[in-house]
């Protein structure tokens, strides 16, 4: 089983935003995250969650790292909320649509797109008192679960999703301490 991860690094390639963020960074806030690390996280999570998705030999997803300005535009367009957010996920697999039992082994099953605002992630990491990499891992896990059909429409489903995110972070060696129960 292989997962292809397409990374669009709009945020870190934008020098003005990087300069602003680097001025605020301390030595514990190490980024950017190298491609192989993102790929490792998603591959590991896919292996853990594979029994819950249509079987395929190859999977694919896209990850876009961006700023508050771009994610606000997307949030307004797709969720009708004209404000920045931390992560958006656009699932290709719809839960209510029947999926084939087995996908042709030559084809990649496209899971969808995850968009993360690094600016918002940085602020949340500061508020939570942990490194930026931990926050980005948390948001990536959250988006990944959405791609696989998880949702949090009520408190019970929210708690289940948070528990699963914590499990996924621990599986890749990232420790996450929740200091804000509303997360």
UniProtKB/Swiss-Prot annotation:
Keyword Cytoplasm found: yes
Signal peptide: none
GO cellular component term of the entry, any: cytoplasm
Transmembrane segments: none
InterPro entries tied to this protein: MetalPrtase_cat_dom_sf_prd (IPR023091), YbeY (IPR002036), YbeY_CS (IPR020549)
Superkingdom assignment: Bacteria
Record's cofactor remark: Binds 1 zinc ion.
Disulfide bonds: none
Main location: cytoplasm
Keyword terms of this UniProt record: Cytoplasm, Endonuclease, Hydrolase, Metal-binding, Nuclease, Ribosome biogenesis, rRNA processing, Zinc
Swiss-Prot/TrEMBL cofactor(s): Zn(2+)
This enzyme's EC code(s): 3.1.-.-
Record carries keyword Ligase: no
Any Gene Ontology biological process: rRNA processing
GO molecular function (one): metalloendopeptidase activity
Subcellular location: Cytoplasm
Annotated Pfam families: YbeY (PF02130)
Residues reported in the UniProt entry to bind Zn(2+): 142, 146, 152
Family per record: Belongs to the endoribonuclease YbeY family.
Function (record text): Single strand-specific metallo-endoribonuclease involved in late-stage 70S ribosome quality control and in maturation of the 3' terminus of the 16S rRNA.
Protein name according to UniProt: Endoribonuclease YbeY
Organism of origin: Trichodesmium erythraeum (strain IMS101)
């Amino acid at each position: 089983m292989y997962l292809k991860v397409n990374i669009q690094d709009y945020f870190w390639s934008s020098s003005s935003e990087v300069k602003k963020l680097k001025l605020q960074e301390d030595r514990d806030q190490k980024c950017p995250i190298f491609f192989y690390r993102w790929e490792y996280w998603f591959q590991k999570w896919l292996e853990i969650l594979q029994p819950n998705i249509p079987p395929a030999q190859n999977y694919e997803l896209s990850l876009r790292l961006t700023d508050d300005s771009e994610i606000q535009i997307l949030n307004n367009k797709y969720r009708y909320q004209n404000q920045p957010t931390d992560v958006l996920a656009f699932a290709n697999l719809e839960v209510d649509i029947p999926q084939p039992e087995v996908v042709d082994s030559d084809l990649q099953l496209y899971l969808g797109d995850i968009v993360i605002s690094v600016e918002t992630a940085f602020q949340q990491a500061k508020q939570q008192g942990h490194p930026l990499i931990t926050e980005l891992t948390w948001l990536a896990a959250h988006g990944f679960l959405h791609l696989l059909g998880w949702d949090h429409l009520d408190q019970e489903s929210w708690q289940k999703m948070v528990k699963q995110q914590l499990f996924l972070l621990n599986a890749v060696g990232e420790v996450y301490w929740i200091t804000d129960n509303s997360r």
